[in-house]
Each structure stands twice: as structure tokens, then as C-alpha cells.
């Protein structure tokens, strides 16, 4: 009873402090630059979307600061003479509000004043009807999603999910879970879930920390030509940049995990983001009396620096470590049935990549190098007795690796946008499976294989938009191939 009173008092005080904290205001600061020249845009108007009376103008260095903004999710509406008006993605305004960098595109035909009208929809010439942009508000407030983007998109037209309710296997337009592609700041991610099914893209828990996400583009058709291998859908994550003004840190305690994230700058130009999470599902599942005890750790990091006025370098890393052991002490008919066939599972996966971008007037060149790795291991003993190797029924170790180099160029020619690129990759797969099968006699299967494949891709595309934006067109071919296994 005493413990209950202390708990009620603790949560009451926490709620009171939370309500009091929400009553404060915070500044929103950032910088407005030209998208191609990377030079600051002076005297641009920056206002809160939906609250045009509250805003600021940029100074000669393109910097702005809006004071006394209420906490919550906001977008900025930015306009300047000679540039196309822009509404930014959604940002969370709090004590850890990020430094916001806005890129404006020139509009030489604009010679008179404009009125900024933010639209909740985004239409591109490349994917006019099959693109859905997921903002911060939808990530935070989607019911039942637990800030997991794979669960958010389940409610979209044409999207189904695995009949096993706890998994994030997406079935888009009648396809399969293996037909979805994931990209993060232009770098391919093979899977964004813990305890993944090898060869597919599902899993029960997302590796991606939503705190680092700026917005997500979800394509269900008309895929961009530079996204290889997409058959059903593409989820393209764009991450936030680190805070260029101050160091901020955040600790979280969730229903199944604890986490620590931070953002800031290193010296002058480089900015960083990082996130580390550790689950305590093993403790919860043991208290609930479940026969399996999953545990996971994941981490993300992003570093971005300006090498010069026209050159940027971004380094990205994403890693997940999964471990599911068996609770062999659990008794009962259901538990014994599950323990009879569930193996012990260990997985390690990571992706690391670097992207260099050069702005050369109307041309933007991007070179991306990335490597992803998956190590999947299953182990099972007869009656879960590992005292003797004679009881071994399954030992599996499967490793997948892929290294990708991609170079592309995008040219802006007034109403035309032209892009072209090339991609080279090398994939390596190894498998060693030792399995004992029980039929009318005992059979021992020892399977070993190794496979390496060199692949390539060529893509190009062009987009056109009329002066009044009433007519847009886009077309882009892509060719992929590969050499014989090595």
C-alpha cells in the first residue's frame, strides 16, 4: 500500500511538471540558403504556417530567429522575392528544437508580391498520385502505431500487413514483404526491423528512432528511377541535421526500452545526431511467464559537414543487435509446445554509408558509397538440452553483405529537370546449415554455400513543369544487370 501511494505521488508530480513545462515558449532559429549556389538568402520572410502574424526576416547571413513559440508541431512558410515560396516539413518545437535549414529555389519569372498558402499535400512531377509524405505530426499522433512508420502506413489504401499481428510485414498492392525497399538520406537500408525474416523486410520492432526522422516519402508506384529493385513500395527516410547552435541530449523511458539521444555540433562546421536504445523485454516477458525472451539494442548516428561553400559530406550509420533466448523454466502445455520448436536466435545487422554532394551552379552531383551486413544465427537442441552435441538439431549461420557505389547528376534547366546516374554493387552470401531430420530414420544435412554477384545499374530521367504548374510530365528509364556468380 505504501508503494502504491509513492507511485501515485510520483506520477502525479511528473504530470504536473509536464503540464507546467508545456506552458512555456521556445525560440525557433535557422538559416535560409539558395538551393543551388548555397549562398544565404537575405531578407526572406519566415512565418509559422497557419500563424502568419508570428515570424521574422532573415539577416544578411540568411539567419532568422522567431521568439516565443508555443511547444508543439509546426511548419515554417518561407518566401522571398525571386524565389519560389516553400513550406518546410514539420518540426517539434521544444527545449531541443533543431536548427532549421531551409533551401529555396530560384523563380526568375516571379516579379510581383506573392501570398504564401501552405498546402497539406505535396505533389511531384515524378510521382503525382502514388507519393504520400509522412510528417512528424502523423508519426507522433497516429493511433496504435507507437511511432513506428511500418504500422502507420498500414492504414493507407492498397496496403495490407501480415496476418501475424505483431510483425511489420508490409504487403503493398498485392505484392510481398520482400518487394519493399528502404532508403535513408539516399543510402539503401536492407531492413528497418529487429528480428527480421531473412530475405524479407518484416519484423516486430523498428530499428529506426523516430526522434531522428524529419519526414518520410512513401511511394506505392511510379518509383524514382534511382531507386533500384523496388517492386511494391519505397520508404524514403530523410533525417534531421544536428543542431548547429547548441548541444542537446534526451533520455527516454518507454514501455519496452530505454534510450539516449543527442544532437549538436563538433567545433565549427560538422553537426551530429546519435541515438542508442536498449530494450528490457526479457524482464517483462519473464514476469509474464512467456517461453521466449527477446532482447535488442540499436543505434543510429549521422554526421554532416560542409567541406566548402559548394561541397557537403554526410556519414550515416544504423545498427541493430537481436538476441532471443528460451525460458526453459516455464511450464505448461502451451509453453512446452512452443519450446519444442522455437530456436535461439541471434542477429546482427548494420549499414554504414557516406554521401558527398557538390553544387556546381545548375548542376548537383552526388556520390554515395554504402555497405550493409546481416549475420543471422539459429541454434536448436532436442528438448533444449545442450549438454551434448548429439542433441543438436539445428545450427544455422547465414551472412549477407552488399557494397554499393552510386554516382548521379541532376541539372536544373528552367522548367526542365534532368538527371542521370550509374550504380555498381557487389553482393556476397554465405550459408552453413547443419540440421538433423527425424523421419523413419535420422538424417543429418550439412549444407554449405557461398555466392558473390557483381551488379550494375544505369538510370536517367527528365521532368517538365509548365509556367502555371497545371501541366507536369516525367519519364525515366532504368536498366539493371549482373555478372555470373563468383
Regions found by a protein language model. Name each.
Residues 21-113, 117, 124:
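Periplasm-facing N-terminal accessory domains of Gram-negative outer-membrane beta-barrel systems
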Residues 23, 109, 163, 230, ...:
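Transmembrane beta-barrel outer-membrane domains
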Residues 73, 148, 167, 203, ...:
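Transmembrane beta-barrel architecture of outer-membrane proteins
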Residues 77, 105, 152, 173, ...:
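Transmembrane beta-barrel domains of outer membrane proteins
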Residues 84, 89-92, 97-100, 117-223, ...:
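Periplasmic N-terminal accessory/gating domains of Gram-negative outer-membrane beta-barrel systems
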Residues 133-135, 201, 290-295, 329-339, ...:
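Flexible, surface-exposed loop regions and adjacent strand-edge segments
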Residues 181, 215-226, 232-240, 247-291, ...:
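Predominantly transmembrane beta-strands of Gram-negative outer membrane beta-barrel pores used
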Residues 304-322, 343-486:
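Face-selective signature of the C-terminal outer-membrane beta-barrel domain
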